[in-house]
């Protein structure tokens, strides 16, 4: 290769493209980036284990589709992505043609693609190239400059052979996700700073570049000539960290772009190594060395797959800057000028070599004169290299996928002649050259610099090491992202490198020469660690020659030894000893050969156990005494000697005492189980297409077991060392005994808190024994945690290893708990833990762990307790450990669980957790109760905490629980008999698994079930009973029966008065499922009215904040019920929630009159009387009034019962998401149709302007990411906030709102009372004011959002019902809408539609409102920005001038949307209504679906305005147009009714509201909108996860007829929606079927389809397509037909 080509190897980073995919894409980025314009190539491999790979996830995806826009080909003001589809049907296609096509995209493309052709991207792979020159212009990172994007994604269409496979579709979506996300990130980077990566490393790119440039100047002299000759630009191959900035799992497969690219694109270039983080460097070294070593493009270069790959990018040869090199390297290492080629191979092998060596200062020291190796000199060595590489490749890939990477600190470099400079090492360390066939020495160097960066992620000892600046940046990223590399991995890498270098003679020769010149030894102090120079050693061996086979054998041996000893890794890291400087001693090579021969000749004779034992002993020695060997040579000698010795005594190996054997078996079982689980998981996660070979399985198992054993050894020895060390203080035995005694005492006294006790003991012990109590007890509270785990969980980040180790040492539990996330720390002791380790990145959820734990417990340590006891008697360390271990295993039941939980969540999180639990439970319960109208008791499937995995609910368990009650109840609504505490306990006892699961929820050691005061339990039961009796539950079931309605009313009223206000109001629930909303909403509203109607108001009032009461009650409940009985808590919370919900619904249900508060309401006394009471009374009155109205109420009730959609089918199991919503995981969503969460009070207050509660399903947008059950709660802000909101915001705001409302009610209420419909005459202004307040206040909190949605519906309703009375219409509308509930996503806000009462159907129809929602969503999204959005809305409203001026100002203030609503004329309303009706018709049959469009204009005006306040500015008419427009316009809110997107959409749509005016204006509007949208997007909070930026998607096909353009566009639409991109644009010229696409978009918005709906439709289409083959309509046509 040309000497000039410069390779900068960068760490692979995996970016979590999807919020969902925690490890969905393992991305190996091999990028080449040159300083000036570098091309970055990053290959991402989609992994099947990603959430995004889950069909369920997509089918249940509730995100709102983003908007679609089309732009003229010229427009370039938008970030863009080009998806290049490399699929070609016939290879016969003229290559030149294809090449030309690629050149059109970018002149760089053909070269890059050719270089990749060796390994064409597979279906699950996507290659991201950025920095390519644009086809017609200079590529510039400035997107506006580049017609193509900075990111060109090369995708091989996955649809080729399996066009109909769902997996294919998902893969495609994920590819698009990756591409789009990369562009988003790039935009962010560009905006924030291109140097972010460097910022991380604390060195700016420029500074690094300068350093390198300086260094390179020296090289330039040599290189320039060559460069000129070659005329090639050097390609900077550096993984663009910027690009792949997100460090993810270290496990990434990479392509060796650099290999191929280097070969192809770079051709001959000098590869300058950029210093990579050592970890990475090693890999990259191997990869690059091998890759670069190959002068040819041999596929063998594949090592590229190694995680670290280098991508080649072009850069002027003169550009020698090593952006990635960090200054530190400059300081510490001397710049080695390695002959380009030799270095190439060497460097690639060293990865870091040159960089390390490239310290500018040193650079002069190194001879620049090294002659470059001739490219032509490649010899048979290449063949060997390729062979070796291919052989090693699989291992590397496997390793990269499954194991953490090496600790950055210790870079183990095996390089030819150890030329490899350890990354921290000076090049001076370079070894003397050997002949090419001579086996290279292994140089293990600890990079002092690298260690710094790695510290947090890597082993605790790191802190001791210095990290060179160069490594840090990348390093830190990598290290932080990935666990340290396993020894095996390192060994393999070394072996591969060695083999590669060995096989490449030229490189070796070169290297030899260089080494000779550089023989000078260099001692480097890494943090005071001295590395002894061993360079001369190499010289001696250089004379020896090895045959390739022997070399391989030798290398294998060395690798094995190294792997076993873990020299390269942990020991060094842990002890911060620098075995790293173990350079091979002169004898090393001989040893190697001897070992090789020994192995080859005697391996059959040696007892396997003997060899294993010998290696193990060496490993233990190394671990226990890191300084035992001064060099690898010594180690090898020792290993050799030991193997021979042990072989002779094989027979003695198995003599173990019985107890030890038992323990060994136990551990063996645990480890094996864990390994198998891991393997299983891997298999599952592996790409479906990958085949499983038995050999691979065995390898994987071995690998897993080795890792576990290694970890166990490391921990054991580390701890042993600590104990021994500590033993100097209190005697070891004493300490151990002391710890044990204390632990045992604790455990005996409190079995459940055993872990806890132990932790304390350990802490004490640490304090006594450890001179460094600060370390040992660094985090006492953690120590207290049952498992010191939390304390240790930081381990990789880390406490001093000693600190962690000590307590863990003392207490295995700690060990087990150590760091489940860090595979290094996982102990095989605990199966559950192991499982965790398997997940590494993810802790298994507690429940899972629990179950596993139990299994392991049963299978493994049935007698753990006994062992434990035995152990107590023993004083020696081993026994202590055993006992501890046993204890660990044994205790699983509570202490372990608790411990686990605490490990995962610190005690500090308990309160938060509790709150979350309460909230989520309440929501869930309400949902379940609603679901269980048949008297089933809500048994919750435990939601496993920890990883936020859904624990599969115990279906049988739940069904059993429910069955009992089912049998008697039938469909009629029966009172739900609340389970008594005793009953719950009994059931829990009967179903231990259930109990266990329940216990996962809230476990506070401090709680004692026994303390439950009777009064509390009584109250709880009472509340539960009342709640259970509430109609909601039964009604929501969707089995609404008229009789049940009446009955419900009676029951409801009764209950209401009896229920304590606090309990009733306790938790408002929000529904995350928009669809569910529709149904449940309607039901709920219906239910609620009857419920409240019959009752008397509860007299429990007290101005005391409901919040206080509620929170007190809940806390009490929790404390009392405690632990395993969260069930009760759930019950109560649920009941409270449901009651609140009921009340809210009732309000909503009080159809038109809701809003009109009658003077009779106690509103005036709000200050003194409990707001709750007033609220209820008020509701009751409304109900009564409605009853009087008769026709209305009857109609409404009828509508409710008949017209309500039955709740959408619920998944049989209700998954309770721990209150942590996992927006990503489909499971996280409760499938249960959440009852509409009326923010009971919140909604009420917000809607109070309308005087009706908006029982609006929370807008999809906000909730989309949340679990259905909890989403409402979470939607708004996230767990913490949720809790806050629940208790404080919700209550406070609702109370406040209620008070205001009451006042309002007092003023206007009388009027309202006078005339339920029209009476509200004066209320509008008040309502508006209130609404404004609510909007501004609540908007932020999220109620506003709800209101907005509801407003949309209501607005329609209001408009329709405007006739009745503009003022009253709002209230009417609200009820109607609620009934309509129709808008699954929309909240039907009673507030908005007084009219709704009249047109319940319409409210159903209001579905369309979702379009309006667009603006609403904006508000929601804007909640933070609500005010800004509102102004926009205001403008819209103004635009919609028709709205009554009087209302407009207020409305505008409160919500511009309201204005727009007002604005909409009756016609528009009618139209909209019709549309809505049509939409509703699908779901709703209400005859009333259309309310008379006759609603008076005035009513529409005032109401509309009011509605608009909450509704989107878009009026029904404008909105409808908008929706159409939005459909057509990418900018307009394509997802008006879609949740989150709505906001974005709103943002866009608001600006685009004018667009709504005419479709004709779409194009222009699109442009304007896109601009405005962009502006807004930037301003809008949008999704935190993704920048709200619009993207231009360009699709480029080598063969245009290949892909299904419509399908692709649809999938891209889905991907963009998933990422929260507000709008994606397509080039008009590319999207031939623009009109149809726009129609489809319009349809989707009209139908309020979510991403999941679109995905489902696509899947159906593909299936159909597969079946019919011919005559299938195009996707768009089919969708339109479907619609």
UniProtKB/Swiss-Prot annotation:
Q: Which domain of life does this protein belong to?
A: Eukaryota
Span list, region PKA-RII subunit binding domain: 910-927
Instruction: Identify the keywords attached in UniProt to this record, alphabetized.
Output: Cytoplasm, Phosphoprotein
**Biased segments, Basic and acidic residues type:** 1469-1490
The record, for InterPro entries, names: AKAP_110_C, SPHK1-interactor_AKAP_110
Q: Name one matching Pfam family.
A: AKAP_110
Compositional bias per record (Low complexity), positions renumbered to this chain: 1492-1504
> Is Cytoplasm given among the entry's keywords?
yes
Q: Which residues carry this modification: Phosphoserine?
A: 1006, 1066, 1088, 1101-1102, 1105, 1240, 1269
List every stretch annotated Disordered: 1-30, 275-320, 582-601, 960-983, 1359-1387, 1415-1518
| Compartments in which it is found | Cytoplasm
Cellular component aspect of the GO annotation: cytoplasm; mitochondrion; Z disc
Which GO molecular function terms does the record list? protein kinase A binding
Segments of skewed composition (Polar residues) = 1-14, 289-301, 1362-1371
Tissue pattern of expression reads: Abundant in heart ventricle (at protein level).
Q: What does this protein do?
A: Anchoring protein that binds preferentially to the type I regulatory subunit of c-AMP-dependent protein kinase (PKA type I) and targets it to distinct subcellular compartments. May act as a converging factor linking cAMP and sphingosine signaling pathways. Plays a regulatory role in the modulation of SPHK1.
Q: Which family does it belong to?
A: Belongs to the AKAP110 family.
Query: What free text does the record give on domains?
Result: RII-binding site, predicted to form an amphipathic helix, could participate in protein-protein interactions with a complementary surface on the R-subunit dimer.
Assembly: Interacts (via the PKA-RII subunit binding domain) with the RI subunit of PKA. Interacts with SPHK1; the interaction greatly reduces SPHK1 activity.
Write down the PANTHER family for this protein, in alphabetical order. Answer: A KINASE ANCHOR PROTEIN, A-KINASE ANCHOR PROTEIN SPHKAP
Q: What is this protein called?
A: A-kinase anchor protein SPHKAP
Species of origin:
Rattus norvegicus
